């Protein structure tokens, strides 16, 4: 039996290889670089790797081949397993930009008095002498940087995967590092470890559903490739029961990653317990990668059987928006409130997925569902990373002050920080002149054009509900008095280094610019074209 050498188009996938290469080098750094120098080496390596990969993504995007009638640009590479097309590269760019912000937050040390926000010795039991000694000596886990890079590489591969097997491998590559990172908080170790365990257990459960669904779809179509699956669906060559159950089980795995109801229960616990830098990276990156994979799977592999999965998404989108918006109202912790806000935003994004897919079905100047969802992900990513960066600044003697009562009067003591946080919240609420307003307008418009008006009505109502809990926090910061009775000390705002400051500044600038001048990014999403098939 002859072995056939696989063909790898290095010129197309080298940004992805850079990310994985930096992750591998980061592992070697842990073994060969002295502990005292690891922080600088690992942080510089991760930031440089992300920047190089981002530049590479731009260069690859400039040279994409135009296919067919010009609606799609790109190629199917690596023996048909990876689609390097316009949407994939747009998503890669988003992931790398937000990963750069995440890396800067990972590298922040001023807020914790000269050490990072990560545990000094992860293997030490909370409250033991070993943990106290690790804290006293100022130890920290620099392995978080290669873990972040492995997760980033998995996210990029997840969004570009062109067959079910590659999609599953990418899912595991992005998930496993995040499970570890969620349990490495320096403060509130038990809460962090609980979050990591819940995330791992539920994530493993959802991965099992995904893998079983892939097996059923393979049984239906005889192929793992998206194009071949679509041909089998169009020609109705197999058992429809296998197909429908397979679509449902694949959807479980994807809906878990985006935090959609009823697979959202991990979101508030993990967002609250994980180090806030990890939460920021995960909140933006995981949602972007998972929606990229979902769009490609539903539009390319199951595009010929739209009415088999669309009614399911109608129901899930409405439930997700309602549950996220209503439960966020009763939260008393900032990170849990942002977690349920994230659930509601997942519902808004699912509304966009239900929209019109082909530009030929729309009038000139209207956006497709792919363009609308991509733009929404950009606006949400900048707002959520910036918001969590601000959360790291509000602190008391126990570390970050997440309880609402500790945020009372922050607007009078630190008006700039409170104003920036309020601006991010207003963008998430979809207030005009912010990026969030344009993002919601885009996804609601495409869903309405596709006839999903019940979902749009529910989305508008949930947006109104969401304004309540966002404005509630703003009123808390600016118009309520400090409360020190029975609640301990009032939280203060810690001055960050240039790393966190830069992340917040870019988030504010992008949110403002995209709200006032959204055209260039909408055009960029339109120029990305459709998925290659």
Swiss-Prot record:
Main location, first listed in the record: membrane
TM stretches of this protein: 13-33, 40-60, 87-107, 141-161, 164-184, 200-220, 243-263, 275-295, 310-330, 337-357, 373-393, 417-437, 451-471, 502-522
Membrane topology: Multi-pass membrane protein
Compartments where located: Cell membrane
GO biological process: ATP synthesis coupled electron transport
A single GO molecular function term of this UniProt record: NADH dehydrogenase (ubiquinone) activity
GO cellular component, one term: plasma membrane
Top-tier EC class: translocase
Presence of keyword Translocase: yes
Keyword NADP among UniProt keywords: no
Keywords: Cell membrane, Membrane, NAD, Quinone, Translocase, Transmembrane, Transmembrane helix, Transport
Catalytic activity: a quinone + NADH + 5 H(+)(in) = a quinol + NAD(+) + 4 H(+)(out)
EC assignment: 7.1.1.-
Protein function: NDH-1 shuttles electrons from NADH, via FMN and iron-sulfur (Fe-S) centers, to quinones in the respiratory chain. The immediate electron acceptor for the enzyme in this species is believed to be a menaquinone. Couples the redox reaction to proton translocation (for every two electrons transferred, four hydrogen ions are translocated across the cytoplasmic membrane), and thus conserves the redox energy in a proton gradient.
HAMAP family the UniProt entry points to: NDH1_NuoN_1 (MF_00445)
Family according to the record: Belongs to the complex I subunit 2 family.
Assembly description: NDH-1 is composed of 14 different subunits. Subunits NuoA, H, J, K, L, M, N constitute the membrane sector of the complex.
Name by which UniProt lists this protein: NADH-quinone oxidoreductase subunit N
Native source species: Nocardioides sp. (strain ATCC BAA-499 / JS614)
């Amino acid at each position: 039996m002859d072995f056939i050498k696989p063909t790898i188009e290095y010129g197309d996938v080298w940004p992805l290889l850079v990310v994985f290469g930096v992750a591998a080098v980061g592992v070697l750094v842990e073994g060969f670089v002295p502990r005292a120098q690891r922080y600088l080496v690992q942080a510089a390596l991760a930031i440089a790797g992300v920047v190089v990969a981002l530049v590479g993504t731009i260069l690859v995007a400039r040279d994409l081949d135009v296919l067919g009638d010009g609606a799609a640009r790109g190629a199917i590479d690596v023996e048909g397993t990876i689609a390097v097309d316009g949407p994939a590269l747009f998503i890669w760019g988003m992931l790398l930009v937000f990963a750069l912000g995440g890396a800067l937050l990972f590298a922040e040390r001023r807020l914790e008095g000269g050490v990072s926000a990560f545990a000094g010795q992860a293997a030490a039991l909370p409250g033991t002498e070993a943990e106290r000694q690790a804290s006293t000596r100022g130890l920290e886990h620099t392995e978080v940087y290669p873990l972040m890079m492995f997760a980033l590489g998995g996210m990029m591969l997840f969004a570009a995967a062109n067959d079910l097997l590659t999609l599953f491998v990418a899912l595991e590559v992005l998930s496993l590092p995040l499970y570890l990172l969620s349990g490495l908080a320096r403060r509130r170790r038990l809460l962090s470890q609980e979050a990591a365990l819940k995330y791992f257990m539920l994530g493993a459960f959802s991965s099992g559903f995904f893998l079983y669904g892939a097996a059923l779809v393979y049984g239906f179509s005889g192929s793992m490739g998206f194009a071949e699956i679509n041909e089998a669906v169009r020609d109705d060559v197999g058992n429809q029961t296998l197909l429908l159950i397979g679509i449902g089980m694949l959807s479980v795995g994807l809906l878990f990653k985006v935090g959609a109801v009823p697979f959202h229960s991990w979101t508030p616990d993990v967002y609250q317990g994980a180090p806030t830098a990890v939460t920021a990276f995960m909140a933006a990156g995981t949602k972007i990668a998972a929606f990229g994979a979902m769009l490609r799977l539903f539009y390319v592999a199951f595009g010929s059987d739209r009415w088999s999965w669309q009614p399911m998404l109608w129901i899930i989108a409405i439930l997700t928006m309602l549950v996220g918006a209503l439960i966020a109202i009763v939260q008393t912790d900032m990170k849990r409130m942002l977690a349920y806000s994230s659930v509601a935003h997942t519902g808004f994004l699912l509304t966009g997925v239900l929209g019109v897919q082909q530009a030929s079905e729309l009038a000139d100047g209207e956006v497709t569902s792919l363009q609308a969802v991509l733009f929404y992900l950009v606006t949400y990513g900048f707002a959520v990373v910036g918001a969590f960066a601000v959360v790291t600044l509000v602190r008391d003697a126990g570390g970050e002050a997440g309880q609402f009562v500790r945020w009372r009067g922050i607007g009078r003591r630190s008006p700039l920080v409170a104003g920036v946080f309020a601006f991010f919240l207003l963008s998430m609420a979809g207030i005009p002149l912010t990026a969030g307003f344009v993002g919601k307008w885009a996804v609601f418009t495409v869903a309405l054009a596709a006839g999903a008006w019940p979902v749009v009505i529910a989305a508008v109502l949930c947006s109104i509900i969401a304004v309540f809990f966002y404005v509630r926090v703003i009123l808390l910061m600016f118009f309520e008095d400090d409360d020190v009775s029975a609640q301990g000390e009032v939280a203060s705002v810690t001055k960050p280094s240039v790393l966190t400051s830069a992340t917040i500044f870019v988030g504010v600038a992008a949110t403002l610019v995209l709200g006032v001048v959204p055209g260039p990014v909408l055009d960029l999403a339109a120029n990305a074209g459709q998925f290659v098939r």
